[in-house]
């Protein structure tokens, strides 16, 4: 009550911030008459002047009013667009490192030019992050004219571009690209073997377009660079033949072999199902021994494959979750409706879906490097974002990214009519009403955009409209190439456009059709008469559509997030245009079926509702919103859980990447090697001759053998001890250290100091990378099963932190030991041979990187759903998948493949 009283007196925090920023708008507007009088050359000279002022110690905030006024005037001259006052406010919010919520059609792309220009003056690089390559290239081309005119360089990064071009793009003052490309380039940079192979500078300032899509929707899944593992995909194909013979039960207590947890997207075998599955697997020869049982340790791999196959058949649907194109399974993004080419689900799910669809099954992958979007974007010194829908997720932006959401008022009042939801008993009644609404709009000449949640639904609606003779366009992942054309015409009188969520971002739907597209089709040589005729025809269509009520939005289903629903509604009513929206729902929709209260369905059936009966009731609408809040909270828990786990990885990642940077930058790593050598030799001697011990406890023969096998040194310690009457453990350690130092000095004298320095650097980088790769595999394995500790009354996150630290410490010790072992056993080569080998290794590393897979991994691989489920009382563990190897399997007691002569378990097997 007190809060509401204070808000009425002083205004909300959002209103207070807008009032403060309006004072700066007044200053900018006061400068406009002076700036307008400047010639082009004088206006362009402002950029070097600002740079000089910044170099002299002035702050960005001090020059902001004048810089914004210059950018506004330059935009008017170059682009023919002048920033509105509300756009100036949006630009200030972005400069302050906050999120600007701006409605569709308010010109977010133009708003970004203000803070981009201001912050690019520092010369440290500005990254403008978009959701797809098309928007990155489009915005770089359009806004690049303005930046170039003002004397700033612009680059755009995209997959597959030449190395030199990408380095140049990152060296520009302003760089456009997608969130995925910026993330993968960061990981690639931290796999490079020389500074010349790196792309990015320091992460200085980023503006994220459609910030909710990137930092929330896509934050559930990490970016991963992976290489193929050696395990054959044959088992996926064999298990796939068995799954159709298992029967689904309606609930956990029903009859059948398995039941589905739709909230967690998991499949669980019943007790009877386990027996039936064992029987089928034995018949197929996949299980070898009936007495061991399905969950015996040696059969965990089979359980992993069976679980993946069950999920592929029971949960993941073709033309909903994925499409099959050119013999490949391509994921469809559940939030945007776009295809995610090149991305693969983890935990064997993608292979299981490939087996289900009868396309070639690709091998599973081993992680080489990974990072989440949360930790990637939190590394920028300053981060900001813009979107049409952020306020519903303001708490998450603040708690995870430290970003405040500021709602920017529209330039003109919004007049869109949002009609109440209509709820039907079943899907048939709902779609009958949708079709009737579409036909009514088409007859009246009102354009209509129909939003669907899947490709399957969009094609079903399309078929019904085709039979009814209603002309329409379909925009989904299968027709993504025609997206720009379809969206450009979606505002034509009577146009009917059926679209998945992909139509929601990036391009405005203009009433009467896109005038710019028509001008572009005319060509640059078109006469003024031709352009006038085009403009006249467009104005007539524009007025006709406004008279018919503007763009009408039809939602065929509520999304899991209210924000996605608001995005769809926001397609209508841009810049004060008329428009309307309505959602049609049924009790059979996924959201209602899975998350809404049972009493809603029972009450409607008790009231005797029939197929075509409709309910418009606030109570039902509140229940729907309550269901959406449940899903949003569940998804937030998953993202927060993922971040908690990745924060552990991130601390380790920072240490490793900082060490790599130090190695790459160093002219010489001799001091590092000398320090490591001292530690390694001390630990080695202490294993056989413990400090402060007596000679009866010493194992001199073992120490001699280890020095011979690991360091290639022949040292007779037994004879040395016999020759001295008084000698202790510390003296032995000192003598071994002296001998090893002399051994290294001999190597250096033989091959030359410069060659030795280059070799030390190369070995340290290579061993560190190999150790980190193997450590990531262990961390994956640990993470996938850690939530099971909850059943032993232990806190999974604390257990994960503790064991991750132990693994990391072990990895660092192994890296130290391996560096010294390799350098001690180095063969003497000429400088020319060493240079040639280094170049070969660099080229091989680049080739491996080119062959790597770049994934935006499914969240299942992080155990997030499982732990959230476990914390909420779930009790069905998901089998842990096995870590795959890059090399053929070596037995613990076999000779180590490195050629040391030791058993594998005493040599490189310590890392496995």
Curated annotation (Swiss-Prot):
UniProt-listed GO biological process terms: intracellular protein transmembrane transport; protein import; protein targeting; protein transport by the Sec complex
Pfam families for this protein: P-loop_SecA (PF21090), SEC-C (PF02810), SecA_DEAD (PF07517), SecA_PP_bind (PF01043), SecA_SW (PF07516)
Location of this chain's protein in the cell: Cell inner membrane; Cytoplasm
Composition bias, Basic residues: 902-912
Membrane topology: Peripheral membrane protein
Keywords linked to the UniProt accession: ATP-binding, Cell inner membrane, Cell membrane, Cytoplasm, Membrane, Metal-binding, Nucleotide-binding, Protein transport, Translocase, Translocation, Transport, Zinc
Stretch list, region Disordered: 869-912
Positions that bind Zn(2+): 896, 898, 907-908
Enzyme class: translocase
Record text on cofactor binding: May bind 1 zinc ion per subunit.
Catalysis performed (reactions): ATP + H2O + cellular proteinSide 1 = ADP + phosphate + cellular proteinSide 2
Any Gene Ontology CC annotation: cell envelope Sec protein transport complex
Gene3D superfamilies: Helical scaffold and wing domains of SecA (1.10.3060.10), P-loop containing nucleotide triphosphate hydrolases (3.40.50.300), SecA, preprotein cross-linking domain (3.90.1440.10)
Cofactor: Zn(2+)
UniProt: ATP binding residues: 87, 105-109, 508
Assigned protein family: Belongs to the SecA family.
Protein's job: Part of the Sec protein translocase complex. Interacts with the SecYEG preprotein conducting channel. Has a central role in coupling the hydrolysis of ATP to the transfer of proteins into and across the cell membrane, serving both as a receptor for the preprotein-SecB complex and as an ATP-driven molecular motor driving the stepwise translocation of polypeptide chains across the membrane.
Protein name: Protein translocase subunit SecA
Gene: secA
